[in-house]
A protein has these predicted regions:
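Repeated loop/turn-to-beta-strand initiation elements of outer-membrane beta-barrel proteins
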Residues: 5, 46-48, 137-142, 169-174, ...
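Membrane-embedded beta-strand positions in outer-membrane beta-barrel channels/transporters
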Residues: 6, 10, 35-36, 128-130, ...
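Transmembrane beta-strands of outer-membrane beta-barrel pores
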Residues: 13-17, 54-58, 135-137, 144-150, ...
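Outer-membrane beta-barrel translocator domains and adjoining extracellular loop/strand segments
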Residues: 19-24, 62-66, 115, 152-154, ...
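Residues that define the transmembrane beta-barrel architecture of outer-membrane proteins
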Residues: 26-34, 123-127, 134, 154-159, ...
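Residue-level signature of outer-membrane beta-barrel architecture
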Residues: 40, 54, 132-135, 164-167, ...
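Outer-membrane beta-barrel translocator/channel fold
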Residues: 58-95, 177-190, 205-209
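Flexible glycine-rich, low-complexity coil/linker segments exposed to the extracellular/periplasmic environment
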Residues: 83-122
Length: 209
């Protein structure tokens, strides 16, 4: 507590035994998995989070949806690591409650693209880190994650950086950069955004990406 440091390790073990199955070359198998998270409150305004062999076993499962459209279903983030400080990286334009402006959702950074495939199945994350600084005027965040390769996707690095500046109590301008890199290629997206409270009943939410 005196160092404002929290270390949370974990160890998982599994034992499988197959009987009366001659097609299996190893009828008994024991596996171990270990990892953990580290949270360091560097100052009252800044926090560093580190994770390796990240375990998302406690995350709630997605509800079952029959999707008959050609678009992906938008599921909310449920993993604790990505829920922390999610509001800092969550810039975008969401549809209005009455859908008067259409149902389109524009979100440059979507954390569910990390560690999950398109069907919501987990892909192991080897390691990652996140730094967040918050003050009355400025907010800064950066996150870097390394995802293991799978049968359908090579190992991939994800990065997101965010800066926002508060203009008074109700207005804000900011920028966001996201990057994704693997052996198949890379892409980078830059975003500028702003929020302005024009009156008690009117507000302006803008974004250029």
């Amino acid at each position: 507590p005196g160092r404002n440091l929290r270390i949370q390790p974990y160890v998982l073990t599994s034992y499988d035994r197959y009987k009366n199955n001659t097609s299996i070359t190893d009828p008994e198998k024991t596996a171990f998995r270990y990892g953990g998270d580290i949270k360091w409150a560097i100052t009252p305004h800044s926090i560093l989070d580190l994770t390796f062999n990240t375990d998302f076993a406690q995350a709630d499962a997605d509800r079952q949806v029959n999707n008959v459209t050609r678009f992906s279903v938008f599921f909310p983030e449920r993993r604790q690591f990505f829920l922390e400080n999610a509001s800092l990286f969550g810039t975008g334009v969401a549809p209005s409650e009455d859908l008067s402006g259409g149902s389109m959702r524009i979100q440059p950074f979507f954390s569910r693209r990390i560690g999950l495939d398109d069907s919501g199945n987990p892909i192991p994350i080897d390691a990652g880190g996140r730094f967040v600084y918050r003050s009355a005027k400025n907010n800064i965040g950066a996150m870097l994650m390394h995802q293991q390769g799978s049968s359908i996707m090579p190992a991939t690095d994800f990065f997101v950086g965010r800066f926002s500046h508060n203009l008074g109590r109700l207005n804000r301008i900011g920028g966001l950069v996201t990057a994704r890199n693997n052996s198949q290629g890379h892409n980078i997206v830059s975003t500028l955004d702003g929020f302005f409270r024009l009156s008690e009943s009117h507000q302006l939410n803008m974004m250029v990406s």
